[in-house]
Amino acid sequence: MDYLTTFTGKSGRLLRGTASRLWGLGGGGEARQVRFEDYLREPAPGDPGCGPGELRPPSPTSPEGPDTGQKKTLDKKDGRRMSFQKPKGTIEYTVESRDSLNSIALKFDTTPNELVQLNKLFSRAVVTGQVLYVPDPEYVSSVESSPSLSPVSPLSPTSSEAEFDKTTTPDVVHPKEAPPSSTESSIRPARVVSSTSEEEEAFTEKFLKINCKYITNGKGTVSGVLLVTPNNIMFDPHKTDPLVQENGCEEYGIMCPMEEVMSAAMYKEILDSKLKESLPIEVDQLSGRGFCHSKKMTGVPAEETDSRSRDQGNDSVSTAPRSTEESLSEDVFTESELSPIREELPSSELRQEKSSDASSESVQTVSQIEVESLTAASESADVPDHTNANSGRSSSEVGALSHETGLSSLEIATKEGDKATGNLQEVSGPKEQSTDIKGQDNQDSFHHENSLQQEAGEDSLSSGETVELTEKPTVLKDQQGKELKRDSETEVEELRKLWKTHSMQQAKQQRDTIQQVAQRESKHRGAPADAHGEGSSLLKEKRRHRLHKFLCLRVGKPMRKTFVSQASATMQQYAQRDKKHEYWFAVPQERTDHLYAFFIQWSPEIYAEDTGEYTREPGFIVVKKMAESGPDEAPAGEAAAREWEITTREDINSKQAAPAKADLEPESFRPNLSDPSELLLPDQIEKLTKHLPPRTIGYPWTLVYGTGKHGTSLKTLYRTMTGLDTPVLMVIKDSDGQVFGALASEPFKVSDGFYGTGETFVFTFCPEFEVFKWTGDNMFFIKGDMDSLAFGGGGGEFALWLDGDLYHGRSHSCKTFGNHTLSKKEDFFIQDIEIWAFE
């Protein structure tokens, strides 16, 4: 075996380890001598190595089998080298001739990344006949198979060497060892690791997939799928939608990176009057106008709540990657899989369900329920625990938990987390945490409630039974004591998540308080309670499943079209750079809470890596807009319509700095003119300056052509442009006294075709100032001939056209700028022209 030492690296270690197991030390302590022969024969008694005291090669009838048996074992081992244990919750699928990884993922409602992770593929290429593991659509997770979603998950070893040793150890060498049964594997202590390997973690993505409607500005409303990931937001229209079949997917497929999202707000109705007019009737009727969504659960019996919590299972936001041996089908948020996340507690009483293993509970759901329970208990501190009967109180009536209280509870729990005594202790089996932290008598009592999934045949505690933990350590059972050390880190980690979701809960309390006030005002206006009666309750019951809320995404740059080429998408993005970048989606009401939780979960990290201390500014913050009542709108109209808003700190700072900037704008936007303008007033110059390209700011305006100075000739105009290398501004005054014109990105010249860039735009002061910038539909900016000068084009019409004598002109709407007629009449007579350069 000396030649085996020549192999180095990982493969050498595996080869030497396998050889030592196959041909290691014999029972007498002597090394087994193995001869490799090209043919099989019976050894003679006199052959060396076959003496009485030495081991003989096994005969064909021996239990160990002959050399051919070893060869078959090696072949079998080599076949196993690329295989692994079948993950739970999966089925086998054989790749067909026209299959690709994307088509297979689409067929089984998963993602290509999950298939790569599930099958440990090295590339996305698949071949015909290849067997892949795909999620089983009929798989129902159980206690043994459902993965734990805690930040510190007990995972099986993912090392490739350990996996190779486990799968390739032949039965002939270790006949006493057998694969562990499912019962043994479920009760054996698992190795605690922080996460999966980097290779597996790179493929793990969480996302929301929501069926909604995209409300465009002037191009109708289409249905499709809104895909929200930690990195991007994308909308794909349904091909069966009538508008998509009529206009194509190019108009409606959009996406943008998450870092460009300035704010995301949820409204009960659309505030933009133009969008509201284009809203379909069915969406407008289901928008919930006048119906306040306070998310109350008044009068819900305990049995219904328990059954609802059991149905929820693992359907909540995941916070940590999972092992490849576990089911990945629950990572995806779909309409059919995800039940609404509970936000309000129907009772301040603590109910616990005892189960053998509660690893299937999600950390996000646990933390969220814990925060809500903390909030509910903070108001009812003066009521004893055994007399709390306000089962129908919603969080909007309770109020927000104070910041100081949350900090103090976090500090206490963090200090006691390592000891796992005092404020935190294990109640039942591994990873089951139902705690009640009591501080002082008749003061703030905090209830942590876990609605754990209950299996058939398992005992459960009564709904009124509570387990109270005092600050004195209690003696745990032997089994609990063994789990205590392992769960202490998990408790501290969950407290981090608890504090993280606490800030989210505070914002919800503010939002619900606004809605509560609006409800009370509407009731106070004289609507009798009897008038609502059964009809109102039935209507609300119907609307609960049919209502739409309106998601408004404000982005820094226009969203990119996904069904057009990269060049066209970039061109259209640039054309819409100065427009209002708001995108509206009609989202089902039951998915609004999922969106809120997702934005909070996947916003930039606000915690340190190893501690629960607040160290950085949040990437997204929840704000309440203090809008002043304008002359046209009712006070706090937008605040009443808005459900919630998540925005960036930069966006808030820019809004707060807007008034100060507005005061400085008149001075900063007054350029220096080489000659006084006879066509533009000072306020008109200021308005124009705000829309000029950035490369013109700071340069004085130089008059390079004027009909009063140079005459009315297009050829003279071209001659005065010679040698210029700046944008030029043309201002025209017609015989009706109307002022309009165009900004050209390049000086005017005679050209064979259209020239210019997207900086070109047309404007008019008739009757009010309007600027029409490039729409991105085409690139017909400027066209210069010896007998005419034109701006814009498409469909045979120009936005602005001048003849060779600079006497007659014409203006039409065109696709290049999306403008209307710049003058009062389509045909006009030119009275005066000024052309300004910036140099």
Swiss-Prot record:
Positions bearing Phosphoserine: S83, S194, S195, S197, S287, S327, S329, S339, S488
Bias-annotated ranges (Basic and acidic residues): 69-81, 163-177, 340-356, 433-450, 469-497
Pfam families the record matches: LysM (PF01476), TLD (PF07534)
Domain GRAM span(s) in chain numbering: 206-261
Gene Ontology process terms (BP): adult walking behavior; cellular response to hydroperoxide; negative regulation of cellular response to oxidative stress; negative regulation of neuron apoptotic process; neuron apoptotic process; response to oxidative stress
Superkingdom of origin organism: Eukaryota
GO cellular component: mitochondrion; nucleolus; nucleus
UniProt feature, compositional bias: Low complexity: 140-161
Gene3D superfamilies, alphabetized: LysM domain
The LysM domain, residue ranges: 91-134
Disulfide bridges in this chain: none
Stretches for region Disordered: 38-91, 140-195, 292-401, 415-540, 648-677
MF terms (GO), sorted A to Z: oxidoreductase activity
Modified residues (Phosphothreonine): T111, T334
Function summary: May be involved in protection from oxidative damage.
Family under the similarity heading: Belongs to the OXR1 family.
Name of the molecule in the record: Oxidation resistance protein 1
Source species: Rattus norvegicus
